[in-house]
Amino acid sequence: MEQLFVVRLRELGALDRFWTSGRAECIPVTGRRRVGKTFLLEQFAVGKRVIYYRCQLKGTAEQLPQLGAQVAALSGDPVLLAQPPATWPALFAALERLSRGGRLLLVLDELPYWVTRDESLPSLLQNWWDEQGRTLDLMLVLCGSAVQMMDRLLTGPAPL
């Protein structure tokens, strides 16, 4: 048990270095189920401006408004709260505005669930990251237990 705790401290330290790097970061967190990825990320998120979204086995039409509602809640912007971002361009614009207010952590936990229902998601995220996300004061964490799928997302023909 003590050894596992030490490993987690090392992982937290690595995440902290990415957090304080002063630049945009896109960080994959992968591993088998039940090894503590979510717990690690929840601990890391404490005290940070964070949007922590747990992906589901649902399509984008259902999940994007849920993610948009979390973005709106963090922003506190009455306009966004009244009409949370429900399209990718609106969500990305809201993330850009939020990042101007200080370092922002966006965690997409169990991303393979969402990708299973929307295969276009990796290319959409990659295009946004390449064109805009990498310029923001943002740390994007892509987490998943489906190790093979995460490997394809990160090392395939168009890696994130």
Which residues fall in each region the model found?
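Phosphate-binding site recognition
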Residues: 1-160
